[in-house]
UniProtKB/Swiss-Prot annotation:
UniProt GO BP: translation
Gene3D superfamilies found in the cross-reference section: Ribosomal protein L17
HAMAP family: Ribosomal_bL17
Complex formation: Part of the 50S ribosomal subunit. Contacts protein L32.
Pfam families xref list: Ribosomal_L17
UniProt record similarity statement: Belongs to the bacterial ribosomal protein bL17 family.
The protein's name in its UniProt record: Large ribosomal subunit protein bL17
Entry keywords, A to Z: Ribonucleoprotein, Ribosomal protein
Xref: InterPro entries: Ribosomal_bL17 (IPR000456), Ribosomal_bL17_CS (IPR047859), Ribosomal_bL17_sf (IPR036373)
Length: 127
């Protein structure tokens, strides 16, 4: 299996990809470098495919990878607050959205290079 090292150790790279994948699932659009985006595309598509499967084993596999972060907070009419995590958003919002799609859930758009070091920057978003 080939992958990009991204100039980091194995554990740092795994943490970076977990964070970026979780941020992409929560915000549905992030700005990052081209190399990172191409790696995140792979993991994000795997997570959405797990979400589409929807069984208990898929939920546990996704929970092992996606960070436990708050995706949204909503107030109900009776003054109660509903907090939705990134994992809940994946299975309840994103999976039904892509139910009829067989892959290609992300899009990478090139933008201007980063000002400090000229690194190629992109916007990666969910289609």
């Amino acid at each position: 299996m080939s992958y990009r090292k991204l100039g980091r150790t194995s554990s740092q790279r795994k943490a970076l990809l977990r964070d970026l994948t979780t941020d992409l699932l929560i915000n549905e659009r992030i700005v990052t470098t081209e190399a990172r985006a191409k790696e995140v595309r792979s993991t994000a598509e795997k997570m959405i495919t797990l979400g589409k499967r929807g069984d208990l084993h898929a939920r546990r596999q996704a929970a092992a990878y996606v960070r436990n972060e708050i995706a949204s907070v909503e107030e109900q009419d009776d003054n109660s607050v509903v907090v939705k995590s990134a994992l809940q958003k994946l299975f309840s919002d994103l999976a039904p959205k892509y139910a009829d799609r067989k892959g290609g859930y992300t899009r990478i758009l090139k933008t201007a290079p980063r000002r400090g070091d000229g690194a190629p920057m992109v916007i990666i978003e969910l289609v």
